[in-house]
Amino acid sequence: MPLLLSSGRRLLSRMAASASYVAGTHSMAFVTAPSQEVAKKIASGLVKNKLAACVNIIPNVVSVYEWKEEICEDAEVIMMIKTRTSRLEELTKYVRENHPYDVCEVISSKIDQGNPPYLDWISEIVPEKK
């Protein structure tokens, strides 16, 4: 019976936590990089500095864009970064300081909803802005 009560309390606690998620508390940022090595270095720094909970590095992206009046096409990787919305400014600053491009892509979108335990985990890993 104590085990059942303990499990029930944990379930209720998780349900309460998930019901309290405020849409937009977390964001997903997207950053392209010229190689997997560059992306891994940036990703490791973001996680180490508690600016991101997780960074997925997706290979084999082709970017087509205009630069200095020319159409360019480059093979890149893209990072999908999960963080707190309140930390986006610091995250962008870190990427700009550690990225080889003159103008690096850092764009983001707020997370409206998701798997409650995962969203809770992001909150645990990435502290609120000080």
Regions found by a protein language model. Give the residues of each.
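Positively charged, small/polar-rich N-terminal and surface patches that mediate targeting and assembly
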Residues: 1-130
